[in-house]
Curated annotation (Swiss-Prot):
It catalyses: (R)-pantoate + beta-alanine + ATP = (R)-pantothenate + AMP + diphosphate + H(+). GO terms for molecular function: ATP binding; pantoate-beta-alanine ligase activity. This is Pantothenate synthetase. The keyword Ligase applies. Its main location: cytoplasm. One of its GO terms (biological process) is pantothenate biosynthetic process. Homodimer. Pathway: Cofactor biosynthesis; (R)-pantothenate biosynthesis; (R)-pantothenate from (R)-pantoate and beta-alanine: step 1/1.
Length: 282
């Protein structure tokens, strides 16, 4: 595996491989890689002859500068993991490389980006779209891989690809969890042992809510989850919404649509964790 730091060098490598008819997969990451990222990389390696993994902590998607400073940066460990997964290139640019001048582009995909994360993290998805569109333009991959843990992000990126007419396939990949059910996240490394124990209640509550939902209404299921999280000291619910998996708009009853997802964000201490669960999938 080669580690590349500039767009020019990456494009020089890829142009040769694309000329040979090789398919290129892109896995955009912010580093601090774990088994969830590894599953995306392995899938790309399985489906494409060339896999590029970007490792870049994107400053424009952090609405909380403190979160940006605290975000773990572990490039050496990341490269070892990527090599073990069979990646062809790790693309680790500087901020100056990706943003030679400030990116003033405004992306708006209402109503997808105005709810949930969009409401609580203003500017976040604009920053995501800025960097992902830059990566798509730099790499011009045949496929790009994103995890379903960031469910709203995946929906917005699909819409961006549709509107900007990028010629590539977006591949959503299932959430990877610890053996006990906690959704893998780079932010989990910031949890104390006690916080880690509390955080487990998030996924446990979601799994229980799926059983509960089979015999209860949407509003009863919302209350079930809200009450369960409120009962755990050290957890603070930011939001839990039950939405149409395509439009991300709230649903009032289970029969409203064939694709229903519950999306949750919880503060565990000062660490913000997200997760989701599918109640119905067509």
């Amino acid at each position: 595996m080669k580690v590349i730091h500039t767009i020019k060098d990456l494009q020089a490598e890829l142009s040769v491989l694309k000329a040979q008819g090789k398919k290129v997969g892109l896995v955009p990451t912010m580093g601090a890689l774990h088994a969830g990222h590894a599953s995306l990389v392995k899938r790309s390696v399985n489906e494409n002859e060339v896999t590029v993994v970007s490792v870049f902590v994107n400053p424009t998607q952090f609405n909380d500068k403190n979160d940006l400073v605290k975000y773990p940066r572990t490039l050496d460990a990341d490269c070892k993991l990527l090599e073990a997964c069979g990646a062809t290139y790790a693309f680790a640019p500087s901020v100056e490389e990706m943003y030679p001048e400030p990116d003033t582009r405004q992306f708006s995909y209402a109503p997808l980006d105005t709810v949930m994360e969009g409401a609580f993290r203003p500017g976040h998805f604009n920053g995501v779209c800025q960097i992902v569109s830059k990566l798509f333009e730099a790499v011009k991959p045949h496929r790009a891989y994103f995890g379903e843990k960031d469910f709203q992000q995946l929906a917005i990126i699909r819409e961006m690809v549709r509107q900007m007419q990028f010629d590539l396939e977006i591949v959503g990949c299932p959430i990877v969890r610890e053996e006990d059910g906690l959704a893998l996240s780079s932010r989990n490394a910031r949890l104390s042992a006690e916080e880690r124990e509390n955080a487990l209640k998030i996924s446990q509550t979601l799994f229980k809510s799926r059983t509960f939902a089979a015999t209860h209404t949407v509003s009863e299921t919302l209350k079930f989850v809200e009450d369960a999280i409120a009962a755990v000291p050290g957890l603070r619910l930011e939001y839990f919404e039950i939405v149409d998996g395509n439009t991300l708009q709230k649903v009032d009853n289970w029969n409203q649509t064939s694709y229903v997802v519950g999306c949750i964000t919880v503060f565990c201490g000062d660490v913000r964790l997200i997760d989701n669960i599918k109640y119905k999938e067509s």
